[in-house]
From Swiss-Prot:
It comes from the Bacteria. The gene is fliF. This is Flagellar M-ring protein. PANTHER family: FLAGELLAR M-RING PROTEIN. Residues 274-308 have a biased composition (Basic and acidic residues). GO terms for biological process: bacterial-type flagellum-dependent cell motility.
């Protein structure tokens, strides 16, 4: 039923629209179409052209000297320009950027104080000493290195000073080159970038060691200095620890976010790393895989006898030339036999040399703070079960330990606490709002578009919808006046004068050809028109022929001013005509 009702209403709406458009006539339809086309064109124009900024960027990231020189050049060329509040960007009117760039390129702008090898372009070979050529070469090298450093993210400007080694005939030791770099850094600059700058300068200058390069910023902060080998390693270790802690913290947040939701927990991770370099050499032997390589057998045998005759001590030994008989003596016999066997084996061996130049995690310290109110909401019941918070904290601790890769054997520590978060946290850290004038200037294009669209809609309503609504609005029957019989109603003479109000009504009915044809073809149409309010009929009279109505009004006013007796019908029609 609802669908049928909607279809009927839609059909009625279409019929009413067709009827309304049919009553307007060709002239009004053409005028309405022209007004609509003009409004659409105005809306399209405002959306395309008014939304475009009046100025476009010519160059960004310029130094103050370049901005001043480019401003003078553009002023001489008669090109309007503007400079942003940061003082490093130049704007020109839309459509003049190409001409401005060509003109500035002809003038050699923008330029920089860091001149490179183009110094040799305008240098003549005559009249130059070796000292001047060497100075120019050093200047060119400094300028080229400074340009390369400025290409690093976070470096706004750079200046390089290089001291090359001077050769001397009466010097015992060679002088080593050195360099210093001064940079103007932005927010994205880090300590690792300072070390990178040192390596860059050392690689660009012959025989220059990275430890002889000093890097500092325009605020006077020393970023890297000569002889800080240990400090450089410490900085790298600290940076590496921050990266590891950040990676572990991200892993914990990814694990807790689906469970608790963002903003209901806070994590903190501290990592201690071991970055010592180790070299290990290990040799392993396999006794089961021995192979007999050589066998050596040595055999020795011996047989020895020893006889010893000793005379007995007595008087006979003191008698000269007396043969003494050996009565006592010792004899011994020795026989030896020795065998020696030596077998050599080949045993498989494996030697492993390990050089560890990376890092290992010595200890992790993790702290997790959870919003207790949010934790109680996950219970689903009020009040929550007993020991619910402790059980949830245990689960979260296990989850965090798994996500972070905790190892209790190396002394890792984890602490999970549930507390009530403050609702006003961060209330005192509200961002400072920009001045309303800046906001108004930035949104001026949008405001112009909005005003143009509102004006177009207002014109469409005034010239398009208002006439339609005026034709549709008919006063109630209480405002209608009785129309006399057609034979008794006189018609006004629009050319020569006016007889009565009845004459005017008959002129409205029979004047235009369209109304006359309709009267002849349909009596019901005539009755319907006769029932129309007098004001509406008079408005139609004015729309059909304004000149005749104006002539009638002039004649009536002239008659009234001359003091002639006015016709009662004319007198009753005067307020209606004035209102129309």
């Amino acid at each position: 039923m609802a669908v049928v009702w909607m279809q009927q209403n839609f059909q009625q709406l279409i019929e009413q629209l067709k009827g309304t458009l049919g009553k307007l006539g060709a002239r009004k339809l053409i005028a309405l179409g022209l007004v609509g086309a003009a409004l659409m064109g105005a809306i399209l124009y405002t959306s395309i052209y008014l939304g475009r900024p009046s100025y476009e960027t010519l160059y960004v990231g310029l130094s103050r000297d370049d901005v001043n020189r480019m401003g003078l050049a553009l002023g001489e060329a008669g090109i309007p320009f503007d400079v942003k509040s940061d003082g490093s960007s130049i704007l020109v009117p839309i459509g003049k950027a190409e001409n401005a760039r060509m003109y500035l390129a002809e003038k050699g702008l923008p330029t920089s104080n860091n001149a490179g090898y183009e110094l040799f372009d305008n240098m003549g070979s005559l009249g130059l000493t070796s000292f001047m050529q060497e100075i120019t070469r050093v200047r060119a090298l400094e300028g080229e290195i400074a340009r390369t450093i400025q290409a690093i993210r976070g470096v706004k400007a750079a200046r390089v000073h290089i001291v090359l080694a001077e050769k001397g005939s009466f010097r015992r030791g060679d002088q080593k080159p050195s360099a210093s770099v001064v940079i103007r850094a932005e927010g994205g600059f880090s300590a690792e970038s300072a070390q990178s700058i040192r390596q860059l300068v050392a690689a660009a200058v012959p025989s220059l060691d990275a430890s002889s390069v000093t890097v500092l910023d325009t605020n006077g902060h020393l970023l890297a200095s000569a002889g800080e080998g240990a400090n450089g390693a410490a900085l790298m270790t600290a940076s590496l620890e921050q990266q590891v802690a950040s990676h572990v913290d991200d892993s914990i947040r990814k694990a807790l976010a689906p469970y608790l939701g963002l903003g209901h927990f806070q994590t903190s991770v501290q990592a201690a790393l071991d970055t010592d370099r180790r070299q290990t050499k290990e040799t392993t032997y396999d006794p089961e895989s021995r192979v007999e390589r050589s066998v050596r057998v040595v055999r020795e045998s011996g047989d020895s006898r020893n006889n010893r005759n000793d005379n007995a001590t007595g008087v006979e030994q003191n008698i000269p030339q007396e043969q003494i008989q050996n009565r006592n003596g010792e004899s011994s016999t020795e026989k030896t036999d020795r065998r020696e066997e030596l077998t050599n084996y080949e045993v498989n061996s494996m030697t492993v040399s390990t050089v560890s130049d990376g890092y290992s995690i010595k200890r992790l310290s993790i702290a997790v703070v959870i919003d207790q109110a949010r934790l109680l909401q996950t219970a689903g019941t009020t009040p929550p079960p007993a020991n619910f918070v402790d059980q949830q904290i245990t689960k979260i601790r296990d989850l965090v330990a798994t996500a972070a890769g905790l190892n209790t054997n190396r002394g890792d520590v984890i602490n999970v606490t549930a507390v009530n978060f403050l609702d006003s946290a961060g209330a005192d850290m509200e961002p400072v709002s920009a001045p309303w004038t800046d906001t108004l200037l930035r949104q001026s294009g949008s405001y112009a578009n909005a005003l143009a669209i509102l004006a177009a809609v207002g014109l469409l309503i005034w010239f398009g919808l208002r006439p339609l609504l005026r034709d549709q609005n008919v006063k109630p029957a209480g405002t209608e006046v009785a129309i006399r019989e057609a034979g008794e109603v006189a018609t006004p003479n629009f050319i020569g004068g006016a007889e009565s109000v009845g004459e005017g009504v008959q002129a409205v009915i029979g004047g235009p050809a369209a109304y006359a044809d309709q009267m002849k073809t349909s009596l019901s149409d005539l009755r319907q028109r006769m029932r129309m309010p007098a004001k509406l009929r008079l408005e139609q009279m004015i729309e059909m022929d304004e000149e005749r109505v104006a002539a009638v009004l002039k004649q009536w006013i002239h008659e009234t001013a001359s003091g002639r007796e006015a016709d009662p019908a004319k007198a009753s029609a005067m307020p209606e005509l004035k209102a129309a």
